[in-house]
Every structure is written in structure tokens, then in C-alpha cells.
């Protein structure tokens, strides 16, 4: 989070870097032009960011008590935090929070974004996958999984994000895989309450590794318009165009979230079916530039 008082510091260092590369003095017309341009851009950003801050439940990071930790799958946990200071039900389905943690493992404080699964007036629930491979260990996810316990305090930013339900007069279709289900749960819940046909396709490797099963089952049990379809890779293979086609007859608004390969596969299948991509929305937990639409 960058506040107005930070922009002069950024500008000073940016101009110093430009001078270092170009060899120009601070009074050179080129540097003066850069300084003026930066000032104008900074003013625009400050105004835009202030509008965002005005709609946030709180500014900066605030401490919250962790009241519940649930092992959703072998590598995904959900964390419930509690507050009587803010109305946490005001979060928008699809948004995320940022956690700020410290650990003896790290020489600095680390921050990461995690999508909100659900919430009410006094609680927020967010999901975290323990991100460990042979080549990489997620700094923050391993801290949350291995070092954080119920009763601990954790610093969170206010919910933000632009992944949200759109065109609510149309049927709604959600397609998720793995921890990519995290933002889709609350979106599915909201869509199910809108009295339009609402479907969720949850792609899993095995039936035993199905995150957020209880919440999803509760949504379908309480809303006649909501349907949940489980696609088990070990039994049915990858989710391909021929299977997707049966869910598209009513031209739903589509929301996709999952790993890079999953996103590529679903998006390519929709293109193969000549689906209108203006009604397709997706969220990645990686830089968006790595996923082409």
C-alpha cells in the first residue's frame, strides 16, 4: 500500500536512477520534464487510490484473532478470523485480503494475498494452499500452515479486488480447480441467492481431495437454483470442450479460477466452442500476463 507521503520518496529515487543511467544533471531540461511528468502522474494515482481507500473497511493492516483453522485437503487450510470492530459482511464475493506476517525464518515481514471464502458480520474465512514444490517453498503459506494456531493474532488488510459477479440477469456458471475454488465459493453463494440458474463445476483429482465441500453442499441444499457438478480427473480425465458444452446452452456468465494449465485448458475449450469471451471472467494467483485470452 502506497500512501501520498510515499510518492515524493519514489519520485526522488526514480529521478536519481534516470540521472545515473543518462549522466544528466538535475537541472537538465530532460530531467526537469521527467520530474514534472512524475508529479502529474503521482497526483492522478493519489486521487484514484484515495477513492479506493474511501470505500475500504479500514486502512493499512489491523490485527485479527484466528478463531478456527480447518484442514480442507492435504495441502489447503481455511482460516477464520473474528472482529467486533468492523462489519465484515460488507466484503464483496470474489475479493481478497492481504496478510502481513513475520517469522524467525524470514529477515523481513512478508505479505501475500489470499481470497475470501465466506464471511458474516463478525467473521472472515480465507483459504491458503501450502505452496511447496521440489524447486520452491512458499514463504508465507508455509508460515501459515506450520506456525500459526487458533488463538493467534494475524494482521490483515481490508478486502479488495475486482473479480466479481457481473450481468446478474444471466445464468451464472463457475468453474474451479484446487485452491482456485477459494473466491468462487462466496461468488457461487451470492449468485445462488439471485434467483437465476447457477451452476458450479468443481474439478478435483480425487473425491477425497475436495476443498470447501461442506460449504458448497450447504449452498446447493439451501438454494433450488444452485447445482454443483463434481468432475473427478482420476475417473473422467481432464475437463474438455465436449463436457463443457452441456453447461453452455443458456449462455451463462462464466467465472474461472485455478492454476495456469487449468485456465489455459478451459479458455481454449470455450474458444473451440465459439463461446462469447466477453462473458468469460477469470482470476489467477499468478501474473495475469501469463494467461492469454
Predicted feature residues:
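Globin-like tetrapyrrole-binding proteins
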Residues: 1-61
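Surface-exposed helix-capping loop/turn segments at secondary-structure junctions
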Residues: 24, 106, 166-167
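FNR/FR-type flavoprotein reductase catalytic core
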Residues: 10, 32, 39, 139-293
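Long, contiguous hydrophobic alpha-helical segments, chiefly transmembrane helices and signal peptides
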Residues: 1-2, 7-11, 34-41, 45, ...
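Short, charged N-terminal helix-start/capping segments
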Residues: 2-18, 90-97, 102-118, 175, ...
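Ferredoxin-reductase
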Residues: 58-153, 204-206, 233
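Short, well-ordered, mixed-charge alpha-helical segments that flank or form enzyme active sites
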Residues: 45, 74, 291
Amino acid at each position: 500500500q502506497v500512501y501520498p507521503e510515499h510518492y515524493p520518496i519514489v519520485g526522488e529515487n526514480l529521478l536519481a536512477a534516470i540521472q545515473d543511467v543518462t549522466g544528466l544533471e538535475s537541472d537538465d531540461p530532460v530531467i526537469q520534464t521527467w520530474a514534472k511528468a512524475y508529479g502529474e502522474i503521482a497526483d492522478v494515482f493519489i486521487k484514484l487510490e484515495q477513492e479506493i481507500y474511501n470505500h475500504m473497511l479500514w486502512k493499512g493492516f489491523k490485527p485479527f484473532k484466528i478463531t478456527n483453522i480447518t484442514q480442507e485437503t492435504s495441502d489447503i487450510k481455511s482460516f477464520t478470523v473474528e472482529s467486533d470492530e468492523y462489519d465484515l459482511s460488507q466484503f464483496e464475493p470474489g475479493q481478497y485480503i492481504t496478510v502481513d506476517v513475520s517469522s524467525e525464518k524470514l529477515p523481513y515481514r512478508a505479505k501475500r494475498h489470499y481470497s475470501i471464502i465466506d464471511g458474516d458480520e463478525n467473521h472472515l474465512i480465507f483459504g491458503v494452499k501450502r505452496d511447496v514444490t521440489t524447486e520452491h517453498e512458499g514463504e508465507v503459506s508455509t508460515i501459515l500452515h506450520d506456525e500459526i494456531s487458533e488463538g493467534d493474532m494475524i494482521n490483515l488488510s481490508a478486502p479488495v479486488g475486482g473479480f466479481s459477479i457481473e450481468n446478474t440477469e444471466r445464468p451464472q456458471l463457475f468453474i474451479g480447480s484446487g485452491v482456485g475454488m477459494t473466491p468462487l465459493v462466496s461468488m457461487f453463494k451470492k449468485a445462488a441467492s439471485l434467483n437465476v440458474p447457477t451452476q458450479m463445476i468443481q474439478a478435483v483429482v480425487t473425491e477425497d481431495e475436495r476443498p470447501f465441500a461442506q460449504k458448497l453442499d450447504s449452498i446447493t441444499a439451501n438454494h433450488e437454483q444452485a447445482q454443483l457438478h463434481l468432475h473427478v480427473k482420476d475417473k473422467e480425465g481432464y475437463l474438455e470442450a465436449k463436457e463443457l458444452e452441456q453447461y453452455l446452452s443458456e449462455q451463462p456468465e462464466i467465472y474461472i479460477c485455478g492454476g495456469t494449465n487449468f485456465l489455459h485448458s478451459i479458455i481454449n475449450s470455450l474458444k473451440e466452442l465459439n463461446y462469447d469471451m466477453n462473458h468469460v471472467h477469470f482470476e489467477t494467483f499468478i501474473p495475469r500476463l501469463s494467461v492469454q485470452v
